[in-house]
Amino acid sequence: MNTARGSSSATPPANGVRGAGTKGIPRARREEQILAAAMDEFGRHGHASASMAAIAGRVGVTKPMLYTYFGSKDGLYLACLERVAPRLVTAIEEAMTYEGPAAETPHRVLSAVFGVLEEQRGAWFVLYDRTLRPGTDLHAAAQRHRRTIDDLAASGTADLLRGHGNKDPLDADALKHVWTGTVGALVGWWTSHPDQSAQDMAARCARLLTAIRG
């Protein structure tokens, strides 16, 4: 999918924490804080350029603590990836299998994606990270999730065309590429407009889809 990042204003420290100590913080809570900060850092800068020092600083812990919790920078990225990708897949699947008019499926899917990303829009760019080197375990892990989402997109666009009497596989493939690019572009636009909520985006997409359909 399209992975263009939108520019956005600086994000506050993860979960409002700055300079917090480590004592008295349950491990699960600390992991949540680290993952939130890492998701934003990886989403903004990509795995290759993300700074472990910046992540630690935002949470208020030392770099060694990040390695204690997640083993490595790669381990932390994978934890972020496995946090967002299954949620996106599940949300898309539920939107596609909802018993409603087929013509409304694109809007349901978009609304589902925005809902998952509401609190951390950068999570999309963790999944679609262009800095991951082909042939690495990280790239393979991300590709596995991307293929799942692409397969859902292929199924959905083919179903949409069949509903209009079109069974041409090349038409379906072309529409899938249009769709996946559109979703990525919309998330990128949303990222550069932080004042817009998931509900705002869902309503905007409803208007855009209505205009496109005429």
Please annotate each region the language model reported.
Residues 27, 35, 77, 81, ...:
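Amphipathic, non-transmembrane alpha-helical scaffold segments
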Residues 86-89, 136-162, 173-177, 203, ...:
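Amphipathic alpha-helical packing segments from all-alpha helical-bundle domains
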Residues 113, 127-128, 179, 209:
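Short alpha-helical scaffolding segments that buttress acidic/His motifs in well-ordered protein cores
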Residues 75, 108, 115-154, 165-169, ...:
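Short secondary-structure transition hinges
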Residues 2-10, 167-189, 200-212:
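Hydrophobic alpha-helical segments that form the core
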Residues 1-29, 161, 167:
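N-terminal intrinsically disordered/low-complexity leader segments
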Residues 79, 93-122, 167-168, 175-179, ...:
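Hydrophobic alpha-helical connector segments
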Residues 33, 37, 41-75, 79:
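Helix-turn-helix
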